[in-house]
């Protein structure tokens, strides 16, 4: 075992967490400048392992925390990790960590991260070989010097610590304390013995007079016994007579009470039947009111449906007439439209011909006019231009403008032509779309009709189910009334049971149920729920005849809770307390009940109570524990005999009980308050209630739930159908709207078609004129410039004038004819579009609407609904009439029961009067019996007060009469008066004091033996202490000589035990002799001296005070090594032990450490190079910014530290 690693944080100069690299198991050297933190590192290890830092005050703990710049350190810890591969520490781990944590208010130890106490740590270290009496496995700075300068007495003290004499001293102190206590007790006993001797002498004189007194007193007591015994016998005879009368009266009272109980039971049964009938009547009346409300509501619905049906029928008849009228009007409109279309067909060709001629004439007129204009312009250009070139230039310019204008005209004509073509194409598409929409409209109308029909079918089915549900609701309400009555009955029974049971017990039962319900709700502790079996009373049954005796036997144990195991009860109680629930609970854990088989007597007068109980054999232990040692007996006499003979509890059927301990209990027991009977009634009502609830849940509520589900499904279907209806109707409206829009587009297109055609003709005529002008200008280009037209041009102008006049005349005629034909066409088209066709559309729409209504779907659905409501009205009326009959019968039955109730009440009253009379008689007998019992008790008390009597006293005066007895008693009392001054307790006191004397003498002897044992123990302890010191001195002395010779070759050193005489005035060497005594005392030792010679010569042996400082240090080191060899530790910590040594001795110390390091670990600090030579691992401590750091370094770096400690500072 050795220190493997040290971790420091916040301790003194080590602020940050410092994890020291693992140490070697042999020799480790730590080097560093003064003040760098080497000693603090040693303090850290000592802080964990040594007793020096055990009891720290808060200010001392704060002093150990790091103080420097930066945040304030509030806690520190030092952790040492041991290599435990040799299992020196009794922990089955190869590495063991020990940490100590301190703060302003805490000081804790952790062993392998588990908190432990300081004592645990110290005991663990002692088990690993760390002795409290030898703390020299850690040698701090200055310890060597302290030992070198210590006096002899200090070294003796050290030797005693190493020898472990502290234990002997502690035992000796305990023995001295015990001896003082024994001396005190011995003195007290001596005082008591002296007092008792004096008192016994006085009592010896009083004994003679006491003998005469006792003679007459014995006679008096015998006479008094005889008198009291005669009175007692007379009283017993009278009591027996009264007891016989009471038994007779009791039997009669039992018969009367049984008859009264029968009457009460009958009354309760009748009362229950009356309550049930009243509840039934109330339910039926309530149902009747509901039926009446339903019937009124149904009649209202029927009236509405009848009116709706009539309206639909009237509407259907009116629609038929309207349809005929509309069809007739439609036919007339079609004929008129056909007539107008025919007229239009005749007029339009004429109009087209006239219009074509007109347009041709207009075009020709424009062409001729333009040609004439061009010729006139040609004539005018002779005066307009001065030369041919100027004219040609102008013509070219005009031609360019004309070309551009002609191109514009052509583009306009092409655009209009394209527009007209698109209009034709759109017209065809419009017609196709219109036809398709018309087909879609018919399909949508068909689908709407189908949905309407389906909707009314689903609605009728839903109404039927609602009617059925109403009936089931009424049935459920009736069952609920019965349930309410049962619950009320159950509550009354439970209230009676609660009144007969303690509140704390009932609260306990309720609290246990809450705990179990909490477990169920959380889904936890299922084994606890399964392991709880309820209270005793709920787990067995028996015949009613045994209720009284069973209940008296069990008492409150009827409410004990049976559980599978103590674990179950513990879990329940933990949650019980956690939830802070009220009540009192007692558990019977089956696994902990120790029940033995009982041998029952074989007799016809008694039976084991447990044989009359019916229960699950799984709970046999619990029932044997409660009832196993009780017999049911025929009578009280039998109970008394068997209880004495078999040491068993016995009880009669009436509840009179005889305990095996002798106690008798009994009296009248009111069976009306029997908790078993009440519990049986509660369970019976609970079973009936559960049956009703099951019937309600399984039949009615299940059917209601099924119908509700079906109604919900139908409602969903209706909603889906309504959604589809809205969807299709919206689609229909959308189609109609689209058809209307297409029709309007077609009409608009037709309106714009003719103006576009006229515009096209005008553009073509204008284009033709422009082209003619362009040709004329082209022909003129390059010709001679003339001021007059040529003959040919003049002729052409004249011809054009004639043609223009003729064309103007023809155009005027064609215009008049066209306007006339156009007016006719416009009038006919307007009549067709604005009148006939619009009206035809209206008629068609009205016919479509009529077709939708004529489908008869609404009327059919309404008729079916009317038939269904009529059936429901009829069924409701029949049910209401049936209820009237049932209510009348039930009320008659209830009245009969009330009359029967009155008869039983009278019977119960008669029985009660008889019981009261019998009770009064019984009360008189009881008072008389009480007086006799009191007299009996007085006689027995007086007999008991007489004390023990001789046998002759029971028979000597039996023949005398009471008069003779009283005369003799008077004579005795007269004689006794003479000895009134006698100490009547003299004899008792004499005996008592004699016994006390014997006890005190025995106690005195015991104390003497104890005193002797203590003295012997103290001598043994003193001897052992002496032997331990002697043995330790020899071992240390031997080791010291050997170590010194190794450190100083050729040198010699010895330890000398110094003694003194008894008075301490003289001393001598150990070798010269010792004080002769039976038990040698260690007090004779005054110190341990040291004599050394560095040359080995006996003549040069010197004392410590004669040595130089370095020699003293070397001798002190030799002593420390000697002590360590005597009591070895697994590792050693030396802080600058070579400080005062010269180089030669430092080398010797280094060699010594190297030798010892093969068996133990050494961690040393030094400023000298000699110790580095024997080291296996090196560590350097640096101090920067007031914080220490420790790291592994090489041997060369360690030597640098030692040779020049400023290099790495």
UniProtKB/Swiss-Prot annotation:
Post-translational modification: Acetylation at Lys-113 and Lys-114 by ESCO1 is important for genome stability and S phase sister chromatid cohesion.
GO MF, one annotated term: ATP hydrolysis activity
Localization per record: Nucleus; Chromosome; Chromosome, Centromere
Any single GO BP term: DNA repair
Disordered, as annotated region: 239-269, 281-303, 1061-1082
Keyword set includes Translocase: no
This protein's record includes keyword tRNA processing: no
List of residues that carry N6-acetyllysine: 113-114
Record InterPro entries: P-loop_NTPase (IPR027417), RecF/RecN/SMC_N (IPR003395), SMC (IPR024704), SMC3_ABC_euk (IPR041741), SMC_hinge (IPR010935), SMC_hinge_sf (IPR036277)
Protein keywords: Acetylation, ATP-binding, Cell cycle, Cell division, Centromere, Chromosome, Coiled coil, DNA damage, DNA repair, Meiosis, Mitosis, Nucleotide-binding, Nucleus
Binding site for ATP: 32-39
Coiled-coil blocks: 179-350, 393-503, 670-857, 958-989
GO cellular component, one term: nucleus
Major localisation: nucleus
Ranges for domain SMC hinge: 530-642
Biased composition (Polar residues): 1064-1082
Pfam family, any one: SMC_N
Oligomer status and interactors: Forms a heterodimer with SMC1 in cohesin complex. The cohesin complex is composed of the SMC1 and SMC3 heterodimer attached via their SMC hinge domain, RAD21 which link them, and one STAG protein (STAG1 or STAG2), which interacts with RAD21.
Function: Central component of cohesin, a complex required for chromosome cohesion during the cell cycle. The cohesin complex may form a large proteinaceous ring within which sister chromatids can be trapped. At anaphase, the complex is cleaved and dissociates from chromatin, allowing sister chromatids to segregate. Cohesion is coupled to DNA replication and is involved in DNA repair. The cohesin complex also plays an important role in spindle pole assembly during mitosis and in chromosomes movement.
Domain notes: The flexible SMC hinge domain, which separates the large intramolecular coiled coil regions, allows the heterotypic interaction with the corresponding domain of SMC3, forming a V-shaped heterodimer. The two heads of the heterodimer are then connected by different ends of the cleavable RAD21 protein, forming a ring structure.
Recorded family membership: Belongs to the SMC family. SMC3 subfamily.
PANTHER family: STRUCTURAL MAINTENANCE OF CHROMOSOMES PROTEIN 3
Protein name according to UniProt: Structural maintenance of chromosomes protein 3
């Amino acid at each position: 075992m050795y220190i493997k690693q040290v971790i420091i944080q916040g301790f003194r100069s080590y602020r940050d967490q410092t994890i020291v690299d693992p140490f070697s198991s042999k020799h480790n050297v730590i080097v560093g400048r003064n003040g760098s933190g080497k000693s603090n590192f040693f303090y850290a290890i000592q802080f964990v392992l040594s007793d020096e830092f055990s009891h720290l005050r808060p200010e001392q703990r704060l002093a150990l925390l790091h103080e420097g710049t930066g945040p304030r350190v509030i806690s520190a810890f030092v952790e040492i990790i041991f290599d435990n591969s040799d299992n020196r520490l009794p922990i089955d781990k190869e590495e063991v960590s020990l940490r100590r944590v301190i703060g302003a208010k805490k000081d804790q130890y952790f062993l392998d991260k588990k908190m432990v106490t300081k004592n645990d740590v110290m005991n663990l270290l002692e088990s690993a070989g760390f002795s409290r009496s030898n703390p020299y496995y850690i040698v701090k700075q200055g310890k060597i010097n302290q030992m070198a300068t210590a006096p002899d007495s200090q070294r003796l003290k050290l030797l005693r610590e190493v020898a472990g004499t502290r234990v002997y001293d502690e035992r000796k102190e305990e023995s001295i304390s015990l001896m003082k206590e024994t001396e005190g007790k011995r003195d007290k006993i001596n005082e008591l013995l002296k007092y008792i001797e004096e008192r016994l002498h006085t009592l010896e004189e009083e004994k003679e007079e006491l003998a005469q007194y006792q003679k007459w007193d014995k006679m008096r007591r015998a006479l008094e016994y005889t008198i009291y015994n005669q009175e007692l016998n007379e009283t017993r005879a009278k009591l027996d007579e009264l007891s016989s009368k009471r038994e007779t009266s009791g039997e009669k009272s039992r018969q009367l009470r049984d008859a009264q109980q029968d009457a009460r039971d009958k009354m309760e049964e009748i009362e229950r039947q009356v309550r049930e009938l009243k509840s039934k009547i109330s339910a039926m009346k309530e149902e009747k009111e509901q039926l009446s409300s339903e019937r009124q509501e149904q009649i209202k619905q029927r009236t509405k449906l009848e009116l709706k049906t009539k309206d639909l029928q009237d509407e259907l008849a009116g629609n038929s007439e309207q349809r005929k009228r509309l069809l007739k009007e439609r036919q007339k409109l079609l004929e008129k439209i056909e007539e107008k279309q025919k007229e239009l067909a005749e007029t339009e060709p004429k109009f087209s011909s006239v219009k074509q001629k007109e347009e041709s004439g207009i075009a020709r007129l424009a062409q001729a006019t333009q040609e004439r204009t061009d010729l006139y312009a040609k004539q005018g250009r002779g005066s307009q231009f001065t030369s041919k070139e100027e004219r040609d230039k102008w013509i070219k310019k005009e031609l360019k403008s004309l070309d551009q204008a002609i191109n514009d005209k052509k583009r306009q004509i092409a655009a209009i032509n394209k527009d007209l073509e698109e209009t034709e194409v759109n017209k065809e598409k419009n017609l196709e779309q219109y036809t398709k929409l018309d087909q879609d409209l018919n399909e949508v109308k068909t689908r709407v009709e189908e949905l309407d029909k389906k909707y009314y079918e689903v609605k009728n089915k839903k109404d039927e189910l609602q009617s059925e549900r109403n009936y089931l609701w009424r049935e459920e309400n009736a069952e609920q009334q019965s349930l309410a009555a049962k619950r009320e009955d159950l509550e009354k029974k439970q209230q009676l049971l609660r009144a007969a049971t303690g509140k704390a017990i009932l609260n306990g039962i309720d609290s246990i149920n809450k705990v179990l319900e909490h477990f169920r709700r959380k889904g936890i502790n299922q084994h606890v729920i399964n392991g709880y079996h309820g209270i005793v009373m709920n787990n067995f049954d028996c015949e009613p005849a045994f209720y009284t005796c069973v209940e008296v036997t069990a008492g409150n144990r009827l409410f004990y809770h049976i559980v599978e195991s103590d674990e179950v009860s513990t879990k329940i109680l933990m949650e019980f307390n956690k939830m802070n629930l009220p009540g009192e609970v007692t558990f019977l854990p089956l696994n902990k009940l120790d029940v033995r088989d009982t041998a029952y007597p074989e007799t016809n007068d008694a039976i084991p109570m447990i044989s009359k109980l019916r229960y699950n054999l799984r709970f046999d232990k619990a029932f044997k524990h409660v009832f196993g040692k009780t017999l049911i007996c025929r009578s009280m006499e039998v109970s008394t005999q068997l209880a004495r003979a078999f040491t068993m509890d016995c009880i009669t059927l009436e509840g009179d009980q005889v305990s095996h301990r002798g106690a008798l209990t009994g009296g009248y027991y009111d069976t009306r308050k029997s908790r078993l009977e009440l519990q049986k009634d509660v369970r019976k009502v609970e079973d009936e209630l559960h049956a009703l609830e099951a019937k309600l849940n399984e039949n009615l509520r299940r059917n209601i739930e099924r119908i509700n589900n079906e109604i919900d499904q139908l409602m969903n279907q209706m909603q889906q159908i309504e959604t589809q209806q809205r969807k299709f109707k919206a689609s229909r409206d959308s189609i109609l709207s689209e058809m209307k829009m297409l029709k309007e587009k077609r009409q608009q297109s037709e309106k714009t078609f003719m103006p576009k055609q006229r515009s096209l003709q005008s553009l073509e005529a204008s284009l033709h004129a422009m082209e003619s002008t362009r040709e004329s200008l082209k022909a003129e280009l390059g010709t001679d410039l003339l001021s007059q037209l040529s003959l040919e041009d003049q002729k052409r102008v004249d011809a054009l004038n004639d043609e223009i006049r003729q064309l103007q005349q023809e155009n005027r005629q064609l215009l008049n004819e066209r306007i006339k034909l156009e007016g006719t066409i416009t009038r006919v088209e307007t009549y067709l579009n604005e009148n006939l066709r619009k009206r035809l559309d209206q008629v068609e729409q009205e016919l479509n609407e009529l077709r939708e209504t004529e489908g008869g779907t609404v009327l059919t659905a309404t008729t079916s609904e009317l038939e269904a409501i009529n059936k429901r009205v009829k069924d409701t009326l029949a049910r209401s009439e049936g209820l009237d009959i049932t209510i009348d019968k039930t009320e008659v039955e209830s009245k009969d029961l009330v009359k029967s109730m009155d008869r039983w009440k009278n019977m119960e009253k008669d029985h009660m009067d008889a019981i009261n009379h019998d009770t009064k008689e019984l009360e008189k007998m009881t008072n008389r019996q009480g007086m006799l019992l009191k007299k009996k008790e007085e006689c027995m008390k007086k007999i008991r007060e007489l004390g023990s009597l001789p046998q002759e006293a029971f028979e000597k005066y039996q023949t005398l009469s009471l008069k003779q007895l009283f005369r003799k008693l008077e004579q005795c009392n007269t004689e006794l008066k003479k000895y009134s001054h006698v100490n009547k307790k003299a004899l008792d006191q004499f005996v008592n004091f004699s016994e006390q004397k014997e006890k005190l003498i025995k106690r005195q002897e015991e104390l003497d033996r104890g005193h002797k044992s203590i003295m012997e123990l103290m001598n043994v302890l003193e001897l052992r202490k002496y032997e331990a010191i002697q043995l330790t001195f020899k071992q240390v002395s031997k080791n010291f000589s050997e170590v010194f010779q190794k450190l100083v070759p050729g040198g010699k050193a010895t330890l000398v035990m110094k003694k003194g005489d008894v008075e301490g005035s003289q001393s001598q060497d150990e070798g010269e002799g010792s004080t002769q005594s039976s038990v040698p005392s260690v007090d004779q030792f005054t110190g341990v001296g040291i004599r050394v010679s560095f040359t080995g010569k006996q003549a040069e042996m010197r004392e410590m005070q004669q040595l130089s400082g370095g020699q003293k240090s070397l001798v002190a080191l030799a002593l420390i090594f000697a002590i360590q060899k005597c009591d070895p530790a697994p590792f050693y910590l030396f802080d600058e032990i070579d400080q005062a040594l010269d180089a030669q001795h430092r080398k010797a110390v280094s060699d010594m450490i190297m030798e010892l390091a093969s068996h133990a670990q050494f961690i040393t600090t030094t400023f000298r190079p000699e110790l580095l030579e024997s080291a296996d691992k090196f560590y350097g401590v640096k101090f920067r910014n007031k914080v220490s750091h420790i790291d592994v370094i090489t041997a060369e770096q360690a030597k640098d530290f030692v040779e020049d400690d400023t290099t790495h500072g």
